[in-house]
Amino acid sequence: MTLHNNSTTSPLFPNISSSWIHSPSDAGLPPGTVTHFGSYNVSRAAGNFSSPDGTTDDPLGGHTVWQVVFIAFLTGILALVTIIGNILVIVSFKVNKQLKTVNNYFLLSLACADLIIGVISMNLFTTYIIMNRWALGNLACDLWLAIDYVASNASVMNLLVISFDRYFSITRPLTYRAKRTTKRAGVMIGLAWVISFVLWAPAILFWQYFVGKRTVPPGECFIQFLSEPTITFGTAIAAFYMPVTIMTILYWRIYKETEKRTKELAGLQASGTEAETENFVHPTGSSRSCSSYELQQQSMKRSNRRKYGRCHFWFTTKSWKPSSEQMDQDHSSSDSWNNNDAAASLENSASSDEEDIGSETRAIYSIVLKLPGHSTILNSTKLPSSDNLQVPEEELGMVDLERKADKLQAQKSVDDGGSFPKSFSKLPIQLESAVDTAKTSDVNSSVGKSTATLPLSFKEATLAKRFALKTRSQITKRKRMSLVKEKKAAQTLSAILLAFIITWTPYNIMVLVNTFCDSCIPKTFWNLGYWLCYINSTVNPVCYALCNKTFRTTFKMLLLCQCDKKKRRKQQYQQRQSVIFHKRAPEQAL
């Protein structure tokens, strides 16, 4: 085939016009070394350039030796960094179990796509740039384009999947996270790759058979069906602009929702701090109050007295019915705590129970103290509604098992003068006073016959109060940790999206410009823009390391060959955790 012009095509879009061969003055070579289109006919049938007198073209494609060295060195370094970085991501996912989360499964898929680009696409495109022609044949050309487009589109699809996953995790934490499993993540990743393959591979590989001929000239490599500017424009919109728009909107929604949750958590922490500083002992008809520290001091001053009064301590199940029905429902299983502020009715009236029924919060416990000359009530710290309070299922399952044991142990403790049981009873516990039993018999009748009797000191009452505050702090801590994880995931997503937009936008802008002006953009800009798209695969592992400490430490461990040391540290850590667990187990049973 003979050409008499100086137009060529980009490997991505065939309608790009630019200089295929440099002139001698541009290349800095002596005249006659490089073939010029204006004076020579170029035969590309065998992949060689020849002039009428039989001289062959420069094998460097019109570049100087130093230009070739610079291009090969720069692109080779980028390809090597891309390969090493994404291999580190894959190996890190394999060796570190902490990285095997649903979020990181999507990053693993993205790393696989980037690795393909680093191994195949970057090197073949560098060869194309240096030689200024495609010398590997039509089959290799079609395979390169198919792999390149499938991997690039899979990267975009994976970014979309990550964005939707983050969005639903933030906006629908209860419904979506229950369905968010590794199996479902694998299905979504598989769909991303299948869709990318179906969209591009058959059309690139078999288009010449669909239309009956191959229109790509020898020595060139581009997608045959992208020969029209309108088709090129449409593919750019579908492959880049639409996904970027969707991802930007989703990330904005994620950012707003995260900010909203941050404010809610700050309010919850503030209310928890206020609850800790509140006075929780209120004498009837008096403004006197005392803190847990004061209770301890009183307990120390009365060390010669074993029993200070009457204390009611119980955990009950979910109930919004009057107090008479609450006692019946105390023996049923449930998944939440009860609003048992109605214990105040033991000292006041039944009307207070009805007022507490409609309250928005629920208490863990209520303690009623009867001291000589005083009538005091210890009200527990309020917790959020039971719909928002998560109680471990194993604790709920212990209710029926411990019910009989609690009764027997409580009765034995009274007879033998034993200490408080190791675990708080799930039943109402009524504590008899050694000071004034007769005066408090009316309270006993209001609690019911199912209660047991045990001595309880002020110190134990203080521990009960601390238990309630600790429970609240644990809830806040879990919410805070969850929010921190969501923020880290959002930061990783933002870094990946930002890198994607920065590296892909220049090339796709040139695509739009080329639709209206096919000779306005030099070939050098096209090559730089296309290579910039590849650099996105180089930057992604850096984003993982910068935004995720676990990735960063695992990368460091692998690069420094500290795998054995890591295993030893892990074993030592597990041993320490085991010791800590065995030490805390008896304390948690109290």
Swiss-Prot record:
<feature type="region of interest" description="Disordered">
    <location>
        <begin position="323"/>
        <end position="357"/>
    </location>
</feature>
<keyword id="KW-0770">Synapse</keyword>
<keyword id="KW-0297">G-protein coupled receptor</keyword>
<feature type="topological domain" description="Extracellular">
    <location>
        <begin position="131"/>
        <end position="142"/>
    </location>
</feature>
<feature type="transmembrane region" description="Helical; Name=1">
    <location>
        <begin position="68"/>
        <end position="91"/>
    </location>
</feature>
<dbReference type="GO" id="GO:0016323">
    <property type="term" value="C:basolateral plasma membrane"/>
</dbReference>
<dbReference type="GO" id="GO:0007399">
    <property type="term" value="P:nervous system development"/>
</dbReference>
<dbReference type="GO" id="GO:0042166">
    <property type="term" value="F:acetylcholine binding"/>
</dbReference>
<dbReference type="GO" id="GO:0019722">
    <property type="term" value="P:calcium-mediated signaling"/>
</dbReference>
<feature type="short sequence motif" description="Basolateral sorting signal">
    <location>
        <begin position="275"/>
        <end position="281"/>
    </location>
</feature>
<dbReference type="GO" id="GO:0046541">
    <property type="term" value="P:saliva secretion"/>
</dbReference>
<dbReference type="Pfam" id="PF00001">
    <property type="entry name" value="7tm_1"/>
</dbReference>
<keyword id="KW-0597">Phosphoprotein</keyword>
<feature type="glycosylation site" description="N-linked (GlcNAc...) asparagine">
    <location>
        <position position="48"/>
    </location>
</feature>
<keyword id="KW-0812">Transmembrane</keyword>
<feature type="glycosylation site" description="N-linked (GlcNAc...) asparagine">
    <location>
        <position position="15"/>
    </location>
</feature>
<feature type="topological domain" description="Cytoplasmic">
    <location>
        <begin position="253"/>
        <end position="491"/>
    </location>
</feature>
<feature type="transmembrane region" description="Helical; Name=3">
    <location>
        <begin position="143"/>
        <end position="164"/>
    </location>
</feature>
<dbReference type="GO" id="GO:0006940">
    <property type="term" value="P:regulation of smooth muscle contraction"/>
</dbReference>
<dbReference type="GO" id="GO:0016907">
    <property type="term" value="F:G protein-coupled acetylcholine receptor activity"/>
</dbReference>
<feature type="transmembrane region" description="Helical; Name=6">
    <location>
        <begin position="492"/>
        <end position="514"/>
    </location>
</feature>
<dbReference type="GO" id="GO:0038023">
    <property type="term" value="F:signaling receptor activity"/>
</dbReference>
<dbReference type="GO" id="GO:0006939">
    <property type="term" value="P:smooth muscle contraction"/>
</dbReference>
<comment type="subunit">
    <text>Homodimer; the dimers can form tetramers. Interacts with NALCN. Interacts with TMEM147.</text>
</comment>
<keyword id="KW-0807">Transducer</keyword>
<dbReference type="GO" id="GO:0007197">
    <property type="term" value="P:adenylate cyclase-inhibiting G protein-coupled acetylcholine receptor signaling pathway"/>
</dbReference>
<feature type="transmembrane region" description="Helical; Name=7">
    <location>
        <begin position="527"/>
        <end position="546"/>
    </location>
</feature>
<feature type="topological domain" description="Extracellular">
    <location>
        <begin position="207"/>
        <end position="229"/>
    </location>
</feature>
<dbReference type="GO" id="GO:0045987">
    <property type="term" value="P:positive regulation of smooth muscle contraction"/>
</dbReference>
<feature type="glycosylation site" description="N-linked (GlcNAc...) asparagine">
    <location>
        <position position="5"/>
    </location>
</feature>
<feature type="disulfide bond">
    <location>
        <begin position="517"/>
        <end position="520"/>
    </location>
</feature>
<dbReference type="GO" id="GO:0045211">
    <property type="term" value="C:postsynaptic membrane"/>
</dbReference>
<keyword id="KW-1015">Disulfide bond</keyword>
<dbReference type="InterPro" id="IPR000276">
    <property type="entry name" value="GPCR_Rhodpsn"/>
</dbReference>
<dbReference type="GO" id="GO:0007213">
    <property type="term" value="P:G protein-coupled acetylcholine receptor signaling pathway"/>
</dbReference>
<dbReference type="GO" id="GO:0007207">
    <property type="term" value="P:phospholipase C-activating G protein-coupled acetylcholine receptor signaling pathway"/>
</dbReference>
<keyword id="KW-1003">Cell membrane</keyword>
<keyword id="KW-1133">Transmembrane helix</keyword>
<dbReference type="GO" id="GO:0036211">
    <property type="term" value="P:protein modification process"/>
</dbReference>
<keyword id="KW-0325">Glycoprotein</keyword>
<dbReference type="GO" id="GO:0004435">
    <property type="term" value="F:phosphatidylinositol-4,5-bisphosphate phospholipase C activity"/>
</dbReference>
<dbReference type="GO" id="GO:0007268">
    <property type="term" value="P:chemical synaptic transmission"/>
</dbReference>
